[in-house]
Amino acid sequence: MTHDNIDILVVDDDISHCTILQALLRGWGYNVALANSGRQALEQVRERVFDLVLCDVRMAEMDGIATLKEIKALNPAIPVLIMTAYSSVETAVEALKTGALDYLIKPLDFDNLQATLEKALAHTHIIDAETPAVTASQFGMVGKSPAMQHLLSEIALVAPSEATVLIHGDSGTGKELVARAIHASSARSEKPLVTLNCAALNESLLESELFGHEKGAFTGADKRREGRFVEADGGTLFLDEIGDISPMMLVRLLRAIQEREVQRVGSNQTISVDVRLIAATHRDLAAEVNAGRFRQDLYYRLNVVAIEVPSLRQRREDIPLLAGHFLQRFAERNRKAVKGFTPQAMDLLIHYDWPGNIRELENAVERAVVLLTGEYISERELPLAIASTPIPLAQSLDIQPLVEVEKEVILAALEKTGGNKTEAARQLGITRKTLLAKLSR
């Protein structure tokens, strides 16, 4: 089973234990989120979809059993594994009765943990397989964010209809994938999906590509050619970057859409076509109409149903999934045993603004895999623009108690000094006694 699209939430008020588990699970290829209390865990479960929760029993304020009950109330399908340092039968039985899938004894045996995780996830996979559902990954789209779920819902609603669809989104967001998903989910799925990038061709070539031409219609036309409209007959025609078409071509395109018929270049014969049209653009066509650069009548013909594809900045929570997806692909292609990303590298990917969106992320991961000499991609393998991304000190709006922040800083100092408490205290500007006291809180 591949792990690049699996999200695990670790819930434990022991920050050092959380950090160790995070590093371990990321090393196994999982995406990991942390919660240092039951309340934090519930907030995250409300905001995101997790494949599995790993929760400690003994926590202050809200214990693991209470957290388990609340998680199951929010989402009964999430498998929860309980961790306990107390191997009492009563605790295990109570956890299982409350809805836990299994329990683990602390200190954790890592081999047992890995086996239990795979068993729990395999159990979930079997349950999901028995309930067929349309998912983004079926169409090459990866993500679990609210923005992606909204996009999938729109695709599911639009696909069964015959309505013309206008897809808008920045370059590199995956507009063609949306078009393919609509076609694959429609009644026309057994017929052709024909695609054409309108921005890549000049006016004369675009006319020939769309409508076809007769032999001898122009220099180099040594044989008759059917156009994309005819090739897509019975199926779907996807016109990418339609906002780049010239005014003259817009007139011909409008006529073809209205009359549902085309003429090859150099011919007077009309050919009836049955085509569903999906168009895409990165331009604001309403503004183009107001500026006189795009025909209003064609805009209304195209804009029957509008779908907005979110930029990568609008779905940052999907970046670990996408990065893992591309990592697996390029590791296999380049025959490299890459285990994952370092936490620092993943933080950089998440906080970078991605002007080129998914296409830029894909290129960055491919480059990193090619340059990698070790097992984990670090900031050294990332392009300079990404590696120099500033990471905000506060990465969420949640304000942690000061004692937790202090402990995190101390743990970081200890890691930097190789566990030397005296040196860590010196670098932090406190006494060794104060450091030990703060660690024991």
UniProtKB/Swiss-Prot annotation:
Activity of the ZraS/ZraR two-component system is repressed by the zinc-bound form of ZraP, which probably interacts with the periplasmic region of ZraS. Transmembrane segments: none annotated. One of its GO terms (cellular component) is cytoplasm. Phosphorylated by ZraS. The gene is zraR. PANTHER family: PTS-DEPENDENT DIHYDROXYACETONE KINASE OPERON REGULATORY PROTEIN-RELATED, TRANSCRIPTIONAL REGULATORY PROTEIN. It is found in: Cytoplasm. This is Transcriptional regulatory protein ZraR. Residues 7-121 form the Response regulatory domain. Pfam families: HTH_8, Response_reg, Sigma54_activat. The modification 4-aspartylphosphate is found at residue 56. GO terms for biological process: phosphorelay signal transduction system; regulation of DNA-templated transcription. InterPro entries: AAA+_ATPase (IPR003593), CheY-like_superfamily (IPR011006), Homeodomain-like_sf (IPR009057), HTH_Fis (IPR002197), P-loop_NTPase (IPR027417), Sig_transdc_resp-reg_receiver (IPR001789), Sigma_54_int (IPR002078), Sigma_54_int_dom_ATP-bd_1 (IPR025662). Residues 421-440 bind DNA. GO terms for molecular function: ATP binding; ATP hydrolysis activity; sequence-specific DNA binding. Residues 141-370 form the Sigma-54 factor interaction domain. Its main location: cytoplasm. Part of the Zra signaling pathway, an envelope stress response (ESR) system composed of the periplasmic accessory protein ZraP, the histidine kinase ZraS and the transcriptional regulator ZraR. The ZraPSR system contributes to antibiotic resistance and is important for membrane integrity in the presence of membrane-targeting biocides. ZraR is a member of the two-component regulatory system ZraS/ZraR. When activated by ZraS, acts in conjunction with sigma-54 to regulate the expression of zraP in the presence of high Zn(2+) or Pb(2+) concentrations. It comes from Escherichia coli O157:H7. ATP binds at residues 172-173, 329, 359. PROSITE patterns: RESPONSE_REGULATORY, SIGMA54_INTERACT_1, SIGMA54_INTERACT_2, SIGMA54_INTERACT_3, SIGMA54_INTERACT_4. The keyword Phosphoprotein applies. Keywords: Activator, ATP-binding, Cytoplasm, DNA-binding, Nucleotide-binding, Phosphoprotein, Stress response, Transcription, Transcription regulation, Two-component regulatory system.
